[in-house]
Regions:
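Soluble acyl-CoA-dependent acyltransferase catalytic core bearing the H(X)4D motif
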Residues: 1-4, 23-409, 413-444, 448-454
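Generic start-of-chain signal for non-secretory N-termini
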Residues: 1-19
Length: 454
């Protein structure tokens, strides 16, 4: 198992589960009966076939002293991994989000393949929901999105579709667990590749330091102010979600000369500023966001494991003027992306580890030992499908990412695009981020404020 995947197993403890998830909302077809969820659950369980990825569970080699590797469960219990739930009355979105919050706070069983899917009925408007979670060591956000989309169809009339855990039509080669010799060879290869990457990453670090002396928009690691989000966390979670019109955001990006992601960051920055002012907790220095950058190419590349770099963005939360804040964010992201130009994937990962490694491994040491956090919040934008999708005739109406709070990073904002919408998923430590749902109102206020000013 690559170290970029194993780090999520090494850093996980009971209070800090390290799985990613997603909430999907479906509108059943008009001819669906009242038992549509029960029938779908039975059909999924009876399908039987499970792809290699969804049979993997982790183990330590060399009697527990060696590196992590994957085993395959030959007797997988689908009824354990796939579950059927119903919401309590009155069956509003509030009850659904409360259920997802509880489900996302529990660890996955490492003695079994590291995934679950919950089929949920009882919404008053007739829609049905699915909540799925998979360990970050198995899939990153982009890979999880690709696997989810792979199990859907653009044809509303297609029926008898296999569940998302079924083997793909074109089987992928199985990844053998290997033995001690394979582990040693893999480590040696990593050392050689890592040596080259160290040189590239060192040069990039020097360029970043030089740029920070010239441009106040530049963000250096471990120079972010402490905030109410940068504290040790507990295991309980709170989840909130909302959709925005993608064309509205694109129009604003065109007006301001930025990108959709710049607007997403500006919305988030304005919302965080308002939220912190509500709690009389806004630092004088600007908050800094970690922004994941996918290192994956086309669909032909591997769709498992982790291939993500991290750049830093100055959120300009010290600025009251929304346009000045947006301009600062735009410059900061431009400079951070320029830092990665010409670097190989390993060098990008190594450079990112300077920022993110201590966060992922937070449970292994006392977070409070860091005088300043590397960043204050993670804001991620995962591209999603552009056209409407269906599963056995049920239209996918919403897809909301459910990510990970880390020790010292009590809030995560993840966004995905789908069929003309931007879907925001906010996940936070229930104890450390009170009234998290207020951030949804602040996101709308922040967007409207920037529209009016621009």
């Amino acid at each position: 198992m690559p170290i970029t995947d194993a780090i999520f197993l090494m850093g996980e403890v009971r209070e800090k589960p390290l799985h990613v998830g997603g909430l999907q909302l479906f509108r059943p077809p008009e001819d669906a009966g009242p038992d549509v969820v029960s029938a779908g659950y039975r059909a999924a369980i009876e399908h039987g076939e499970v792809g290699t990825l969804f049979r993997r569970y982790p183990r330590r080699m060399l009697g527990g002293l060696g590196p992590w590797a994957w085993n395959e469960d030959e007797n997988l219990d689908l009824e354990y991994h796939v579950r059927h739930s119903a919401l309590p009355h009155p069956g509003q979105i509030r009850e659904l989000l409360a259920l997802v919050s509880r489900l996302h706070g529990t660890l996955l069983d490492r003695n079994r393949p590291l995934w679950e899917m919950h089929l949920i009925e009882g919404l008053a408007d007739g829609r049905v929901a699915t909540y799925s979670k998979v360990h970050h060591s198995l899939l990153d956000g982009v890979a999880a999105m690709r696997w989810m989309v792979r199990g859907l169809s653009s044809d509303p009339d297609e029926r008898d579709m296999p569940p998302p855990w079924a083997p793909p039509e074109r089987p992928r080669p199985s990844v053998p667990s290997g033995g001690p010799a394979d582990a040693v060879r893999g480590l040696a290869r990593d050392v050689v590749e890592g040596g080259k990457a160290v040189g590239e990453a060192s040069l990039a670090t020097v360029r970043t330091l030089a740029r920070s002396l010239e441009d106040r928009a530049a963000s250096l690691p471990y120079q972010a102010p402490r905030s109410m989000f940068n504290v040790p966390i507990t295991g309980a979670r709170r989840f909130a979600a909302e959709s925005w019109d993608l064309e509205r955001v694109r129009a604003l990006a065109d007006t301001t000369g930025g990108s959709v992601n710049d607007v997403v960051l500006a919305m988030s920055a304005g919302a965080l500023r308002r939220y912190l002012l509500d709690h009389d907790a806004l630092p004088q220095q600007p908050l800094v966001s970690a922004v994941p950058v996918s290192l994956r190419g086309g669909e032909e590349e591997a769709e498992t494991g982790n291939a993500v770099g991290v750049v830093l963005c100055n959120l300009g939360t010290h600025l009251e003027d929304p346009v000045a804040r947006f301009d600062l964010i735009h410059r900061s992201m431009r400079d951070s992306k320029a830092q990665l130009q010409g670097l190989g994937p390993m060098a990008v990962i190594l450079l990112s580890a300077l920022n993110f490694g201590p966060v992922a491994l937070g449970p292994l040491y006392r977070y409070e030992l860091l005088q300043k956090p590397a960043f204050n919040v993670i804001i991620s934008n995962v591209p999603g499908p552009e056209k409407p999708l269906y599963w056995n005739g049920a239209r996918l109406e919403g897809i909301y990412p459910v990510s990970i709070p880390y020790d010292g990073q009590a809030l995560n904002i993840t966004v995905t695009s789908y069929a003309g919408s931007l879907e925001f998923g906010l996940i936070g430590c229930r104890r450390r981020v009170p009234r998290l749902q207020r951030l949804l109102d602040h996101l709308e206020d922040s967007l409207a404020e920037l529209e009016q000013a621009a």
